[in-house]
C-alpha cells in the first residue's frame, strides 16, 4: 500500500459559508471581536455516530438544571470555525480552508491576528483536525448565537473534503 494512502489520508477541508447576524449591535460594528454569532465544528468519529433518530440537545441537563449562560454549548468551542462580522445586515461570504500541513499554534501571535482580522477560530489553525480525520467520520457544523437579540442567518453552508487517492 502506498504511504500517502495510510498516513493522514485527508488532505484538505474547505468550508464555504454565506451568513450574517441580525444587523445591529451596541458595539463592534463590522468587526469579528464584537460578534456573538459564529460557527463551531465537531468531528464525529464513525464508530460514535448515533444509530437512533433522536440526536437533539436537551434543554435541561441530567439533573433537571437549565443551561446557564456559561454552559459550554452556549460559548464558542475550542473548534470555533468562523465568526460573523458584528452588526452587518448583508450576507457575508466566508471561505475557510484547513490543510493537513497547517501548523499555526492556537496561542501564537499569528493565531490572534487571524482571529481578529478574519474571525477564524484559533484552535483550528494547526491542521490537526484534517490530519486526524478518518474515512467514515462525519463533520458537523453548528450555527450559533449567544444572546436573545442575536441571530445567525445562514443562507448557505458547504463542506468539501479532499482525500489522497
Show where each model-derived region lies:
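Core nuclear transcription-regulatory modules in eukaryotes
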Residues: 16, 33, 43-44, 80, ...
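Eukaryotic cytosolic interaction/assembly regions at protein N-termini and domain boundaries
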Residues: 1-4, 9, 32-35
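Exposed low-complexity, polar/acidic, P/S/T/G-rich flexible segments that act as propeptides
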Residues: 27-51, 124-165
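A short beta-strand element within beta-rich, extracytoplasmic domains
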Residues: 6-29, 139-144
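Short beta-strands within extracellular/lumenal beta-sheet-rich domains
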Residues: 1-6, 23, 119-128
Amino acid at each position: 500500500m502506498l504511504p500517502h494512502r495510510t498516513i493522514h489520508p485527508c488532505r484538505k477541508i474547505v468550508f464555504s459559508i454565506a451568513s450574517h447576524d441580525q444587523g445591529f449591535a451596541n458595539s463592534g460594528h463590522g468587526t469579528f471581536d464584537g460578534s456573538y454569532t459564529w460557527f463551531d465544528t465537531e468531528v464525529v468519529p464513525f464508530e460514535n455516530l448515533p444509530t437512533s433518530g433522536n440526536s437533539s440537545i436537551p434543554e435541561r441537563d441530567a439533573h433537571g438544571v437549565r443551561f446557564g449562560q456559561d454552559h459550554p454549548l452556549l460559548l464558542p468551542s475550542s473548534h470555533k470555525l468562523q465568526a460573523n462580522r458584528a452588526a452587518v445586515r448583508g450576507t457575508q461570504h466566508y471561505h475557510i480552508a484547513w490543510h493537513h500541513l497547517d501548523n499555526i499554534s492556537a496561542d501564537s501571535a499569528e493565531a490572534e491576528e487571524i482571529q481578529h482580522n478574519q474571525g477564524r477560530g484559533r484552535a483550528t489553525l494547526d491542521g490537526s483536525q484534517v490530519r486526524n480525520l478518518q474515512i467514515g467520520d462525519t463533520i458537523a457544523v453548528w450555527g450559533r448565537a449567544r444572546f436573545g437579540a442575536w441571530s445567525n442567518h445562514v443562507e448557505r453552508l458547504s463542506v468539501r473534503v479532499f482525500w489522497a487517492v
